[in-house]
Amino acid sequence: MAAFQIANKTVGKDAPVFIIAEAGINHDGKLDQAFALIDAAAEAGADAVKFQMFQADRMYQKDPGLYKTAAGKDVSIFSLVQSMEMPAEWILPLLDYCREKQVIFLSTVCDEGSADLLQSTSPSAFKIASYEINHLPLLKYVARLNRPMIFSTAGAEISDVHEAWRTIRAEGNNQIAIMHCVAKYPAPPEYSNLSVIPMLAAAFPEAVIGFSDHSEHPTEAPCAAVRLGAKLIEKHFTIDKNLPGADHSFALNPDELKEMVDGIRKTEAELKQGITKPVSEKLLGSSYKTTTAIEGEIRNFAYRGIFTTAPIQKGEAFSEDNIAVLRPGQKPQGLHPRFFELLTSGVRAVRDIPADTGIVWDDILLKDSPFHE
């Protein structure tokens, strides 16, 4: 069974379950609120508190469409994401405060620039969000930094999971945790499919397997996941469910976060004593890792593709100056990111392509090519 170190904690094997309190974007752009989230995570007994680092212009193209808020208001997706960026100057104060509170600071990184910024702080690990699982250039880049990597799998097919795992391993990084996850906020318990956890453990014995839970109940799915072998548990939390940000309503409040931590520790103690409890069929679901009916929409919205970042003229070579791996939002999807290195190796456009457009094969293949239908 696999194991590795995150700071002073062993993750995997017979070590205690590693509990990540996911603060995410629930700081709402307020540093004091970020400190309060760290306080809540430490007081609950979580091993780590995790934030998210991203840059809007490295996540979406400039016009990905509109997003309807809980209040029914249509807002620009790009502007919304831009407003949720965590300022770079926060990183060191948050890291120092986590040290003071004796909780490990972690962060998701969604682009190479954010990875560089986090790497400059000698991080304990990198987290890769579900919607970057197919961003193979990012996975390669982070893998080469030689830190433990945790990646989530919401909305993924098993082939996506395998390609991500294989990509990281190919760079010589074997410190990998794979998190089962469901791409719905909140996630209905009947879509938990916790049987995927032992399946992943069997399919990827060199990885540590965990569960990133988006359901609303503090203990039901997390404790069941631990009974099925999950070695990491991650769950969103907030200081107040009534705050207006996108991720507050389904997140745990501080009391519920402590309830989850206590529930997981109790479950671990029972397992050590040989006390077994059945996991409900509702939570077990299927062991087949696939994009479920409730995940298709967000997969189409958020899984990465190759997009132009500037107008490209016929005959112009593709490069990092005119294409990038981005989320489509409401735009038509571009080619899979696995083709990014191919495109930037001297391939030229066979027609004019506007900015902020998904690259398709017709942009590359000549009409008289034997590969063109």
UniProtKB/Swiss-Prot annotation:
CDD domains: SAF_NeuB_like. InterPro entries: AFP_Neu5c_C, AFP_Neu5c_C_sf, Aldolase_TIM, Neu5Ac_N, Nonulosonic_Acid_Synth, SAF. One of its GO terms (molecular function) is N-acylneuraminate-9-phosphate synthase activity. Transmembrane segments: none annotated. Residues 305-367 form the AFP-like domain. One of its GO terms (biological process) is glycosylation. Pathway: Spore coat biogenesis; spore coat polysaccharide biosynthesis. PANTHER family: N-ACETYLNEURAMINATE SYNTHASE (PTHR42966), SIALIC ACID SYNTHASE (PTHR42966:SF1). This is Spore coat polysaccharide biosynthesis protein SpsE. It comes from Bacillus subtilis (strain 168). The lineage of its organism: Bacteria, Bacillati, Bacillota, Bacilli, Bacillales.
